[in-house]
C-alpha cells in the first residue's frame, strides 16, 4: 500500500471534477509490480501485542525518495514519484 501511494497513486482533476473516479482510471500497483517483502517475527511474549499494518506507511516514501537520490543525485519532493518526474528532475 505504501509503495503504491509513493510510486503511482494520484487523484487527477479536470477543471470541474475528479477524473480518477474508478479503479480503471486510478493508478495503483499491481501484484506483479510489488517487490518481495521479507517478514521477521520477533518472539517477545513479555510485551503486549500491537498492530503492525500501518507502521511502515510513513517511512516508505522517504526511503524510496532517498534511494532515488542516492542513485541519481536528484531529489523528488512530491508524490507520486513517477519515471517522468525522475527524468525531468
Model-based region annotation:
Residues 1-89:
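C-terminal catalytic domains of large/alpha subunits in multi-subunit enzymes
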